[in-house]
A protein has these predicted regions:
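Sec-dependent N-terminal signal peptides
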Residues: 5-15
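Small-residue packing motifs within transmembrane alpha-helices
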Residues: 11-12, 500, 508
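Formylglycine-dependent sulfatase
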Residues: 17-411, 415, 424-443, 450, ...
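Positively charged n-region of N-terminal signal peptides that target proteins for export
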Residues: 1-5, 515-518
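Hydrophobic membrane-targeting alpha-helices
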Residues: 14-18, 512-515
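Polyampholytic, low-complexity intrinsically disordered segments
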Residues: 462-464
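Alpha-helical transmembrane segments
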Residues: 505-518
């Protein structure tokens, strides 16, 4: 009843004011930690994100997958990443991306005459052009296809990765600012007779830790250098969000715009636990403290992933983990005059965003999705809707099942059950005395839909790691995709297998020295 009344009100409102369908802006941060925003008490100042939170619906129990591609797949489809077979980041040499048979958000919006723009990160497949966003409902794409680039050089894994509409683009500038500038241009030039969908996927604050000097100096009071750089990257993103809001206001469109903000997963913290565990060896034996790391890209990749400057406190762990710090993220939905400020403790996951948005704009066709519309939760934050959600870690050896207020983490190490409403730090395992609940949650897991896993084996990824920034040793990725479509789909390898073998030798030597010292 509440939902029907809200939708009726919105329809009458638009009819009376002569407005078109509302604009939609989805802003995704990349690896933004729970304690990386000032409204959670962080030392990092985020006034524009805070303003969005304080005047919209703060989604305090917003859950995602613990890595980027799985979360982005859920956003685009409304389906579980496990059902889609996307359970870890899509590697640059991975032939399969988000299934081409899947209908994604811009394709739904096309039916309602939206103009669809994607700016920033895609990361849902790029091995051949058929996976490009411009082949999947987006009218325009400016940014990069892979999981991360150098902020200044726009390089990923040895290849340049920056384009506009399937054409490689070489331009100077800091990636966050370039994404912002192009977004402002689009807003200023758009004919708002037709509604616009802006999917703005910032790379910040994903590694590498790079930021303009003036932003770094702003945080000179932060002693730790990595944290200081991380803060500057968040600052750049927050400034960009503020300017985008001003541009919409200048066009008199801010009141007619739905904004969704979230991070794709928890922050990458300095104490991250890489899997497989042997990847910790370069850090243990001090390679990560050397300048050149012997010129080995595998060592560089490992050490980069130990250079995270995020904080998820008081939530445990972070990116790649199924603990709260990896999957519970800052988030809000904002629509002035229609959604009043509130702090919602109701559960919502990334796969609920698509059906919720389509419900808000009165999309009437049948949906084949796993997520649910949360319009009731947005209009009545005291309405305790329930939902079941399953996540997995980066090597798929640990699963978490959420059915509020309980969360079960199951692995070969045993079962852990937490009441996450009362124990967000996950410090008290209550599995032993609640075996009936454990059984119920295991039953949810057993009935969950799992699709064929599209991920490359970890061993294949390590042969040619996905580095972020650095020297170019191959053709740009957009060019490689077109070549792949014409040839035998050979990987764009930089010939790093010899270094994998050397890495194995180092492991053997390390173990030998350890045994000798014992």
């Amino acid at each position: 009843m509440i939902k029907n009344n809200l939708l009726l009100f919105l329809l009458v409102f638009f009819a009376g004011c002569g407005f078109s369908s509302p604009n939609i802006v989805i802003i995704l941060a990349d690896d933004l930690g729970w304690n990386d925003v000032s409204y959670h008490g962080s030392e990092i100042e985020t006034p524009n994100i805070d303003k969005l939170i304080s005047s919209g619906v703060e989604l305090d129990r917003f859950y995602v997958q613990p890595t980027c591609s799985p979360t982005r797949a859920e956003l685009m489809t409304g389906k579980s990443a496990l059902r889609l077979g996307i359970t870890r980041p899509i590697s640059k040499n991975q032939r399969l991306g988000l299934g081409l048979e899947e209908k994604i958000l811009p394709e739904y919006l096309k039916e309602l005459n939206y103009s669809n723009y994607l700016l920033g990160k895609w990361h849902l497949g790029s091995y051949t052009p058929e996976y490009f966003p411009t082949r999947r409902g987006f009218d325009y794409f400016y940014g990069y296809l892979s999981g991360g680039i150098g902020y200044w050089d726009h390089v990923h894994g040895g290849g340049h990765d920056w384009q506009r509409n399937e054409v490689g683009l070489r331009e100077d500038g800091y990636a966050t600012q370039l994404i912002k500038n192009d977004t402002l241009r689009i807003i200023n030039e758009h004919d708002f007779t037709y509604p616009i969908f802006l999917n703005i996927n910032f790379g910040a604050p994903h590694i590498p830790n790079e930021a303009p000097e003036e932003s770094v100096l702003k945080y000179s009071y932060i002693q730790d250098e990595t944290r200081r750089l991380h803060a500057a990257m968040v600052h750049e993103m927050d400034n960009a969000i503020g300017e985008i809001f001003v541009a919409l206001e200048d066009k008199n469109e801010l009141e007619n715009t739905i904004v969704v903000f979230a991070s794709d997963n928890g922050g990458l913290t300095p104490d991250v636990k890489l899997n497989p565990s042997f990847l910790a060896i370069p850090k243990i034996i001090g390679i990560c403290n050397t300048e050149n790391r012997f010129g080995i890209s595998l060592f560089q990749w490992v050490c980069e992933n130990y250079s995270g400057g995020s904080s998820n406190k008081p939530l445990p762990e972070g990116k790649m983990s199924v603990s709260e710090g990896g999957i519970r993220v800052p988030a809000a939905i904002w629509w002035p005059g229609k959604l009043e400020y509130s702090k919602s403790q109701n559960f919502i996951s990334m796969m609920d965003v698509l059906p919720t948005i389509l419900d808000l704009i009165n999309y009437e066709n049948q949906l084949n999705v796993d997520g649910e519309s949360r319009v009731n939760s947005l209009s009545d934050v005291t309405n305790p809707e329930t939902s079941k959600y399953v996540v997995t870690n980066i090597i798929n050896d640990k699963y978490a099942v959420i059915d509020m207020p309980y969360k079960l983490i199951t692995s070969n190490e045993g079962d852990q059950l937490f009441n996450i409403l009362n124990d967000q730090s996950e410090s008290t395992n209550i599995a032993e005395e609640n075996q009936a609940i454990v059984s119920e949650l295991k039953n949810i897991l057993s009935q969950w839909q799992f699709g064929e896993n599209k991920s490359l084996p970890i061993s294949e990824v390590l042969k040619d790691p996905d580095l972020f920034g650095g020297e170019e040793d191959r053709i740009p990725w957009v060019e490689k995709a077109f070549k792949n479509s014409e040839t035998n789909l050979t990987p764009n390898n930089g010939g790093d297998l010899k270094w994998v073998l050397l890495f194995g030798i180092v492991i053997i030597l390390f173990i030998s020295v350890w045994i000798y010292r014992k």
